[in-house]
């Protein structure tokens, strides 16, 4: 059964970059599971299936790296070129904070309180997001790139729960809801 799950996991992870280039980061996040569980044999099987998926897509006529390069060229021909790299670097990091909300961002300051698996997941997701921002590939693609990673950064909010003050989490929940309402009311997007 474990090997079947490894094959299914590899097939799903292998499909990720073909659904959205933003899901390329999920390969790094997925490595947290075997690192924490210390089970590398199923990971090797899943990794082989990922490689086979990329090769199969290539044999079918879609080479991943050509698609990434075409996306970069299309971005270079668009209106985003008028903004400097540092703009996108700052905007991407700020918008990741907006996506996880005040509780998620606040939880990052106390991430050491989380247990080892949760802490590893959150830190690897944040690290993957920062590497993506530093690479400059995701300029102007915040909603597609960061949303999948934000789901793995948001558990940092669990670090805000103080066992001595069991009701403190309520204020973080209020802040999260208020931030969502403000963003939904104020933000206008052409998409």
Residues of each region from the PLM?
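Perimembrane helix-loop-helix junctions
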Residues: 1-7, 13, 24-49
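Transmembrane-lumen/periplasm boundary regions of multi-pass, lipid-linked membrane glycan transferases
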Residues: 46-113
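Hydrophobic/aromatic-rich transmembrane helices and adjacent perimembrane loops
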Residues: 89-101, 140-164
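Transmembrane-helix signature of polytopic, lipid-linked glycan biosynthesis machinery
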Residues: 125-141, 156-159, 180-189
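Membrane-interfacial loop-to-transmembrane alpha-helix junctions, especially the N-terminal start
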Residues: 2-5, 114-125, 162-173
């Amino acid at each position: 059964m474990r090997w079947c799950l490894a094959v299914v996991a590899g097939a799903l992870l292998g499909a990720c970059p073909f659904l959205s280039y933003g899901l390329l980061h999920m390969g790094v996040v997925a490595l947290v599971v075997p690192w924490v569980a210390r089970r590398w044999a199923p990971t090797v099987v899943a990794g082989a299936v990922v490689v086979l998926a990329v090769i199969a897509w290539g044999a079918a006529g879609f080479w991943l790296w050509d698609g990434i390069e075409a996306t970069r060229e299309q971005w270079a021909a668009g209106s985003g070129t008028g903004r400097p790299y540092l703009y996108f670097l700052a905007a991407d990091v700020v918008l990741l904070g907006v996506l996880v909300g005040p509780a998620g961002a606040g939880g990052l300051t106390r991430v050491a309180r989380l247990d080892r698996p949760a802490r590893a997941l959150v830190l690897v997701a944040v690290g993957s997001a920062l590497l993506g921002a530093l690479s400059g590939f995701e300029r102007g693609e915040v909603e597609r790139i960061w949303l999948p990673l934000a789901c793995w950064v948001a558990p940092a909010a669990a670090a805000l729960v103080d066992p001595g003050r069991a009701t403190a989490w309520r204020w973080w929940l209020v802040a999260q809801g208020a931030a969502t309402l403000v963003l939904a009311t104020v933000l206008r997007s052409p998409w």
